[in-house]
C-alpha cells in the first residue's frame, strides 16, 4: 500500500523545474536566421492558418520518394525534402545528406536521427506555440478549447447536412496506440489506463482544467488534457507522447532516462505530479479546510485506509486513517508468509472468482491484507490505557473507498539477498464487492472468518474491472502491456503502438500486475 504523498513545498517545485539537458545536435541548425526559417516551416507546412496555406500544404507536402502524403510525413530542417517516417525515406535522406534533424508535419515535433528520438528544446517550443496560436487566430479559433460558435454559413451547411456521427457499441474512438520512445512501455500502459478512466475522461474532455502555473508548458495536467484530446480526436495513427515523457522526467527525476522503469512507480509519480499541478482546479478552500484537497485526482483515486492497533492487555484501540492511491498486495511465493486457502474455497465461487484447488484469488489477497496481524514482542507499543509498552495486534480496513480502486500485485521482490519476479497466477473478477473489507463490516468478521454480505442490494461498494496492466519477462528484462475496456464487454490489448481486440478470457487469464476497478454506482457529495 502506497500512501498519498503530502503536497511538496514550493522550493522543491523550483528545483524540479530545471529541465534535463537537451539534444546536443541542435547547434548545427541554430545558425544565422534559424528562427525565421523555422517559423516559415511551421506557417507553411505544419499549422497552416489560412485556407491558401492549407491548400498549398495539401499539394506540396508529399514524400519526395514515393509521392504519398501519409505515413507520418517529415520535412528536413536543412533543405527542401519531404519523406515518409514509416517507410524510412526521411531516414535514408538524413543518412545520405547527413541532415540529422527533421520536423513532423502533423504535430510539429522535432526528430533527431543521431539521438534516434524526438527532442525537446525550449526555444523551438516557444516558436511552435506562438505559430500555433497565430494559426488558431487566423482560423477564428482563438484558444484551443474555446466554445465553438457556428457562423451563418456554417449553420446553413448544418441544415443541409443533418447527419451526425453516433457513438455506437462498435465505435473505436478513444483507441490509439502510443509510440515507444525507448523502454517507455511502462509509461504507455499507464497512459492507456488513465485515458480510459471514465471520470477522468469526462473531466478533461469537458475542459475543466484551469491552469494557474506561471509556465503552462511545464504543467502535466495541461499535457494530459492535450493527450485526451488526441486520444478522442478520431485519429488512428499512433500518438508520440514525447512531451509527456519530458514533463515526467522534469517533475519526477528518479524516472528520467531510458532505463527500464516500474509501471507502478510511474503511476504513483504521475498521480503525485498531477495532484500538485491541479491547484487551480481545487475548490477545497470552500470547505474551510486547508488540509482538504478536492482536485480531480483526489476525487477519483484517493481512499481512506483505517488502521486499528489493539492492546492485548486492556484491549484498547488506537485508530488512524491515512489516504491512499493504491493498495499493494502480497502474493504467495514471496518471502512474506502467506496463508493457505480457506477449506471452503475449493470448487466455490466467491466475489465472481472461481476458486479452484490451489488457486489464489484477488479476494484471498484482500483477506490477507485486512486480517489482524500480531505485531510481536519486538514491536511493542505504548498503550495509552495501560501507560506502558504492550504487545498488540494491527488490522487494516477500508474507511473510505475511492471511485477508482487500483490493486498492485507485488510481483517484484527486492531484498538484500533476493531479487526476483513472482509469477504466481492470481484470479481476479470482472466485478468486485469490497463490502467485506470495509471498516463498517469489521464487526461481522470474527477471528479471520469472512462471509459474503447478506445484503446483496447494497451496491455502494461494487466495482467493475476496466483496465489491467501486465508484465512479461524477468525482473532484469521485460515488457509491459495493458488490457483496457472500451465498452461494457469490449476489451482491447494495448502493446505500445499496436492495438488488438481481446476476449474477456484473454483478460482474466493474464498474469495481472496492476488491476483498475471503477465504482459501479457513484454517490453525490
From Swiss-Prot:
Gene Ontology biological-process annotations: G2/M transition of mitotic cell cycle; positive regulation of DNA-templated transcription; positive regulation of mitotic cell cycle; positive regulation of type I interferon production; protein deubiquitination; regulation of DNA repair; regulation of RNA splicing; regulation of transcription by RNA polymerase II
Quaternary context: Component of some SAGA transcription coactivator-HAT complexes, at least composed of ATXN7, ATXN7L3, ENY2, GCN5L2, SUPT3H, TAF10, TRRAP and USP22. Within the SAGA complex, ATXN7L3, ENY2 and USP22 form a subcomplex required for histone deubiquitination. Interacts directly with ATXN7L3; leading to its recruitment to the SAGA complex. Interacts with ATXN7L3 and weakly with ATXN7L3B. Interacts with MED1.
PTM note: Phosphorylated in G2/M phase, but not in G1 phase by CDK1.
Positions annotated as active site in the UniProt record: 185, 479
Catalytic activity: Thiol-dependent hydrolysis of ester, thioester, amide, peptide and isopeptide bonds formed by the C-terminal Gly of ubiquitin (a 76-residue protein attached to proteins as an intracellular targeting signal)
UniProt KW Phosphoprotein keyword: yes
Name this polypeptide is given: Ubiquitin carboxyl-terminal hydrolase 22
First and last residues of each zinc finger (UBP-type): 21-138
Residues recorded as bearing Phosphothreonine in the entry: 147
Hydrolase is among the record's keywords: yes
Domain of life: Eukaryota
Family to which the UniProt record says this protein belongs: Belongs to the peptidase C19 family. UBP8 subfamily.
Gene Ontology CC annotations of this record: cytoplasm; SAGA complex; transcription factor TFTC complex
Single GO MF annotation: histone H4 acetyltransferase activity
Lineage of producing organism: Eukaryota, Metazoa, Chordata, Craniata, Vertebrata
UniProt entry keywords in alphabetical sequence: Acetylation, Activator, Cell cycle, Chromatin regulator, Cytoplasm, Hydrolase, Metal-binding, Nucleus, Phosphoprotein, Protease, Thiol protease, Transcription, Transcription regulation, Ubl conjugation, Ubl conjugation pathway, Zinc, Zinc-finger
PANTHER family listed in its UniProt record: UBIQUITIN CARBOXYL-TERMINAL HYDROLASE, UBIQUITIN CARBOXYL-TERMINAL HYDROLASE 22
Record PTM N6-acetyllysine, positions in chain: 129
Enzyme class: hydrolase
Subcellular location: Nucleus; Cytoplasm
Amino acid at each position: 500500500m502506497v500512501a498519498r504523498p503530502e503536497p511538496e513545498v514550493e522550493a522543491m517545485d523550483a528545483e524540479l523545474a530545471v529541465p534535463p539537458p537537451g539534444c546536443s545536435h541542435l547547434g548545427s541548425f541554430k545558425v544565422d536566421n534559424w528562427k525565421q526559417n523555422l517559423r516559415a516551416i511551421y506557417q507553411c507546412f505544419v499549422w497552416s492558418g489560412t485556407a491558401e496555406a492549407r491548400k498549398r500544404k495539401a499539394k506540396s507536402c508529399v514524400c519526395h520518394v514515393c509521392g504519398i502524403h501519409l505515413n507520418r510525413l517529415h520535412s528536413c530542417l536543412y533543405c527542401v525534402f519531404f519523406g515518409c517516417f514509416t517507410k524510412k525515406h526521411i531516414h535514408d535522406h538524413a543518412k545520405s545528406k547527413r541532415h540529422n534533424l527533421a520536423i513532423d508535419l502533423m504535430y510539429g515535433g522535432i526528430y533527431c536521427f543521431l539521438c534516434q528520438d524526438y527532442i525537446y528544446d525550449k526555444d523551438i517550443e516557444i516558436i511552435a506555440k506562438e505559430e500555433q496560436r497565430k494559426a488558431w487566430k487566423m482560423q477564428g479559433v482563438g484558444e484551443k478549447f474555446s466554445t465553438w460558435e457556428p457562423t451563418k454559413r456554417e449553420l446553413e451547411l448544418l441544415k443541409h447536412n443533418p447527419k451526425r456521427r453516433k457513438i455506437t457499441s462498435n465505435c473505436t474512438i478513444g483507441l490509439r496506440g502510443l509510440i515507444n520512445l525507448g523502454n517507455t512501455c511502462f509509461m504507455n500502459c499507464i497512459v492507456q489506463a488513465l485515458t480510459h478512466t471514465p471520470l477522468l475522461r469526462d473531466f478533461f474532455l469537458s475542459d475543466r482544467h484551469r491552469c494557474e502555473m506561471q509556465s503552462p508548458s511545464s504543467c502535466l495536467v495541461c499535457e494530459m488534457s492535450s493527450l485526451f484530446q488526441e486520444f478522442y480526436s478520431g485519429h488512428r495513427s499512433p500518438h508520440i507522447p514525447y512531451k509527456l515523457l519530458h514533463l515526467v522526467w522534469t517533475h519526477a527525476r528518479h524516472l528520467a532516462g531510458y532505463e527500464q522503469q516500474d509501471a507502478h512507480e510511474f503511476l504513483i509519480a504521475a498521480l503525485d505530479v498531477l495532484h500538485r499541478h491541479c491547484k487551480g482546479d481545487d475548490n477545497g478552500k470552500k470547505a474551510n479546510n486547508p488540509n482538504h484537497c478536492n482536485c480531480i485526482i483526489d476525487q477519483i483515486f484517493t481512499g481512506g485506509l483505517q488502521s486499528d492497533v489493539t492492546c492485548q492487555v486492556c484491549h484498547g484501540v488506537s485508530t488512524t486513517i491515512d489516504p491512499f492511491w493504491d493498495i499493494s498486495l502480497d502474493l504467495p511465493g514471496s518471502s512474506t508468509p502467506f496463508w493457505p486457502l480457506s477449506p471452503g474455497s475449493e470448487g466455490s465461487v466467491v466475489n465472481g472468482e472461481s476458486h479452484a484447488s490451489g488457486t489464489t484469488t484477488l479476494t484471498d489477497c484482500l483477506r490477507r491484507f485486512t486480517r489482524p496481524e500480531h505485531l510481536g514482542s519486538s514491536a511493542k507499543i505504548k498503550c495509552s490505557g495501560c501507560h506502558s509498552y504492550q504487545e498488540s495486534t494491527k488490522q487494516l480496513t477500508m474507511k473510505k473507498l475511492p471511485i477508482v480502486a487500483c490493486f498492485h500485485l507485488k510481483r517484484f521482490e527486492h531484498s538484500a539477498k533476493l531479487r526476483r519476479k513472482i509469477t504466481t497466477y492470481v484470479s481476479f473478477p470482472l466485478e468486485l464487492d469490497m463490502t467485506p473489507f470495509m471498516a463498517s463490516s469489521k464487526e461481522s468478521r470474527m477471528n479471520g472468518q469472512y462471509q459474503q454480505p447478506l445484503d446483496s442490494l447494497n451496491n455502494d461498494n461494487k466495482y467493475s474491472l476496466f483496465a489491467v496492466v501486465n508484465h512479461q519477462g524477468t525482473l532484469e528484462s521485460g515488457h509491459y502491456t495493458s488490457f483496457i475496456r472500451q465498452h461494457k464487454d469490449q476489451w482491447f490489448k494495448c502493446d505500445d503502438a499496436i492495438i488488438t481486440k481481446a476476449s474477456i478470457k484473454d483478460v482474466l487469464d493474464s498474469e495481472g500486475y496492476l488491476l483498475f476497478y471503477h465504482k459501479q454506482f457513484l454517490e453525490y457529495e
